[in-house]
Amino acid sequence: VLQRIFERLRKTERPLLCTEWMARTLGSRFETHLPLLQAERIGSWHWGLVRGRTQTHLPWGSIEGAPEPGTWFHDILYADGTPYDPAEIASIEASLGTSSRMGNGRSKE
């Protein structure tokens, strides 16, 4: 789906920045989407970094007081800096050509 959207938008001959791409519960994943965005030379913005007050770990339309989701929507880190999913951190680092010490965090709750 994204590929077709990118093809259509390329016709504008303008720089592209994708701001709404990461939504784990809808099938968007760092390991699948970052390489595509990189290959297409499309910038991307990721909403949510640390699980906290903005509650971007919750999916759109979440009901206040509902149980915590098994799968986070956006965020990638717990408040203490531990990765939500160390494999995702490795995928992000691979896309960026960097490495960190974050990949050895706790497992998903």
PLM-predicted stretches and their roles:
Residues V1-E109:
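Substrate-binding clefts and catalytic carboxylate motifs of secreted carbohydrate-active enzymes
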